[in-house]
């Protein structure tokens, strides 16, 4: 399993049961091949990892943001467990290089598919949890998500709501979002969205329309703050 050594170094964790690590990185496309049909893929681990990630992030926020109410904590958690953030964590670990998939999935762009990266990241969290304990998993998630948790400005967590509130407070019409471009394959598209409030315009790019809208709103808020 030497090919996973670098990944384990980035995680700061060495698996006792390497089969769990392999399962966490096995794409469902493998079941299409007879030689792999009895092998496990990451779908069940992804299900567990999603729950573990939500629990750990909730605990971290509850401990670190004592002055925030339930609504603000929910906004921050939503940002920390969204596809965009999970994919950024997966990118830090270079997970796309470790996912085990069929040749067909790979040539179709599977290594750059945000869904695959998100699913493998969540499955990896579950594998760590099953291989160790909740305390170890908590520490690893805390390290991997540290740069995102440090963001203190609620505007960065929920920029669309913040932009809407700014528009209402300034007696402007509500923000208008328009999809202006979609690029890439169907399963790995990037979207470009334009947001407009009065005479202000800004674009945002993301792996989904929702993500692109949030990025556009965040960029416009930063621009308004600096004007």
Swiss-Prot record:
One of its GO terms (cellular component) is cytoplasm. Its EC number is 3.1.26.3. PROSITE patterns: DS_RBD, RNASE_3_1, RNASE_3_2. One of its GO terms (biological process) is rRNA processing. Mg(2+) binds at residues 46, 119, 122. SMART domains: DSRM, RIBOc. Residues 4-133 form the RNase III domain. The keyword Translocase does not apply. Its main location: cytoplasm. Keywords: Cytoplasm, Endonuclease, Hydrolase, Magnesium, Metal-binding, mRNA processing, Nuclease, RNA-binding, rRNA processing, rRNA-binding, tRNA processing. One of its GO terms (molecular function) is metal ion binding. It holds the Pfam family Ribonucleas_3_3. It catalyses: Endonucleolytic cleavage to 5'-phosphomonoester. Its cofactor is Mg(2+). It is found in: Cytoplasm. The keyword Nuclease applies. Homodimer. HAMAP family: RNase_III. Belongs to the ribonuclease III family. Digests double-stranded RNA. Involved in the processing of primary rRNA transcript to yield the immediate precursors to the large and small rRNAs (23S and 16S). Processes some mRNAs, and tRNAs when they are encoded in the rRNA operon. Processes pre-crRNA and tracrRNA of type II CRISPR loci if present in the organism. PANTHER family: RIBONUCLEASE 3, RIBONUCLEASE III. NCBIfam families: RNaseIII. This is Ribonuclease 3. It comes from Rickettsia canadensis (strain McKiel). The gene is rnc.
């Amino acid at each position: 399993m030497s090919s996973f050594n670098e990944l384990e170094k980035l995680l700061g964790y060495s698996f006792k049961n390497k089969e769990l690590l392999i399962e966490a990185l096995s794409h469902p496309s493998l079941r299409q091949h007879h030689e792999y049909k009895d092998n496990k893929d990451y779908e069940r681990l992804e299900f567990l990892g999603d729950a573990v990630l939500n629990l750990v992030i909730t605990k971290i926020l509850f401990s670190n943001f004592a002055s925030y109410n339930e609504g603000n904590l929910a906004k921050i958690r939503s940002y920390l467990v969204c596809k965009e953030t999970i994919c950024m964590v997966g990118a830090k670990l270079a997970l796309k290089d470790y996912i085990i998939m069929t040749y067909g999935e790979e040539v179709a762009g599977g290594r750059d598919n945000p869904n695959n990266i998100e699913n493998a990241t969540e499955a990896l969290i579950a594998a760590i949890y099953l291989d160790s304990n909740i305390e170890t998993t908590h520490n690893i998630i805390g390290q991997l998500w540290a740069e995102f948790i440090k963001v203190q400005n609620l505007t960065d967590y929920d920029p669309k709501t913040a932009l809407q509130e700014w528009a209402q407070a300034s007696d402007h019409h509500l923000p208008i979002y328009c999809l202006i471009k979609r690029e890439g394959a169907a399963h790995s598209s990037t979207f470009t969205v334009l947001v407009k409030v009065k005479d202000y315009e800004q674009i945002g790019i993301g792996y989904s329309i929702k993500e692109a809208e949030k990025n556009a709103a965040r960029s416009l808020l930063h621009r308004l703050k600096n004007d």
